[in-house]
Amino acid sequence: DVPDDHIMAEPVCRGTAPGIAWGAHRISMFDSQAALIAVPTDQMIINDDAFRKNVLDGMAFVQQNNYFLTMGIVPTRAEPGYGYIQINSHVCGNIYKVKTFTEKPDREFARMFVDSGEFVWNTGLFLSNVSYLRECFSEFLPDVLSSLDTETETLSPSQEEHFIRKHFPVYPNLSVESGVLEKTGITCVMKCDFGWADLGTWHGIYEALPKNMEDNVV
């Protein structure tokens, strides 16, 4: 069972940056040296064992290094509905520095990305140690973390949630990629092989699921 104070519900949608900032704040109250993984819900993981290995390897990396580590998948087709990460210099193992992020390019650019061999799909999964994550949020999104740190430090989880319901709607509507990851200059990407599909669109669902003889998904 998951304790109640480990379950946090955003009162309104404000992109991934504010929600992750709140989650990191709560986690740091329990363990300031923790490593965390941010996992979007609208996706499919095909190979659980490979995913578990990639996550454990990634956790070990961010516990030893102050980096954001995104998880990328080598693309199998030119998919304009996905985000893409351009890889840069090699760091270690299957980990590389990130050169660029591109969100949902048109089909022609997606095809160029795939043909170049320099890009992986952006799964939206990323890892970091909590200390470095909070340091970066304090630098790049101070209006998010400063109020959490100064005004909720002595609050109970229920009191903190009351504070969030009041203040969360005025937080910036930003993804963590555009709000933080693209600004640090030292984000890394792991080339993963666990099999992945984005289920955020009907097309993504169609591509991920088996088809019948008429090429339909039921």
Regions found by a protein language model. Give the residues of each.
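A short, charged helix-loop
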Residues: 87-120, 155
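Short, structured coil segments at secondary-structure junctions
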Residues: 1-3, 185
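Short glycine- and hydrophobic/aromatic-rich loop-to-beta-strand nucleating segment
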Residues: 124-128
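Short hydrophobic/aromatic-enriched beta-strand-loop microsegments
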Residues: 3-9, 145-148
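Conserved beta-loop-beta/alpha segment of the NTase-like Rossmann-fold superfamily
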Residues: 5-90, 134-140
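An anion/pyrophosphate-binding glycine-rich loop and adjacent beta-alpha core
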Residues: 117-119, 123, 139-142
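Left-handed beta-helix
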Residues: 130-218
